[in-house]
């Protein structure tokens, strides 16, 4: 069989010759990784954002599948994790007969910009005491932002991390996540 990994972002990790995707290892299958358009090497110049759509992503996967189907004529499995899992679902939606099996891992399905399912879930996980300790820690780290931000910036610089948003905003997201 052939496993087509419907990556939701970049796929440079797949260039590591020792990397094996879980299903391909379990099934001793061929692997094809498809990087999501507008990420890493799959970014066109100039960037025309009107072509960054779920349907176009499914079209990409369909084109790759058609290009390789004569080389790999056996069963085909689509899989992806997180946004890649969403991509697996969308690929199946637009091209239901392209693959024999779709295995999306942790594919989030949002009901809207403000989904509303997260808050009730977060109010139930763990214990009230543990949730309070986490909240207290987050508040303390936010209160000490002026003192901690230089360390955070230094860490980001040392790791070569670059952001499209101001580093102060990234700090806040890191604390809250």
For each feature predicted by the language model, list its residue ranges.
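Short beta-strand element of the alpha/beta-hydrolase
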Residues: 1-9
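Alpha/beta-hydrolase active-site loop signature
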Residues: 10, 36-40, 109
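The serine-hydrolase catalytic nucleophile loop
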Residues: 13-21
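Alpha/beta-hydrolase active-site loop
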Residues: 50-71
């Amino acid at each position: 069989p052939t496993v087509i990994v419907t990556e939701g972002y970049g796929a440079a990790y797949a260039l590591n010759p020792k990397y094996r995707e879980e299903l391909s290892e379990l099934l001793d299958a061929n692997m094809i990784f498809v990087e999501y358009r507008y990420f890493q090497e799959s970014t066109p110049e100039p960037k025309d954002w009107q072509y960054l759509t779920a349907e176009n992503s499914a079209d990409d996967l369909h084109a790759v599948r058609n290009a390789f189907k004569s080389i790999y004529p056996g069963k085909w499995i689509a899989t992806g994790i997180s946004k890649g899992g969403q991509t697996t679902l969308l690929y199946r939606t637009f091209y239901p007969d392209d693959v024999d099996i779709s295995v999306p891992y942790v594919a989030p399905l949002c009901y809207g910009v403000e989904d509303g399912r997260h808050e009730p879930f977060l109010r139930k996980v763990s214990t009230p005491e543990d949730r309070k300790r986490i909240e207290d820690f987050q508040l303390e780290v936010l209160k000490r932002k002026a003192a901690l931000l230089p360390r955070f910036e230094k860490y980001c610089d040392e790791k070569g991390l670059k952001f499209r948003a101001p580093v102060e905003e990234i700090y806040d997201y890191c604390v809250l996540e």
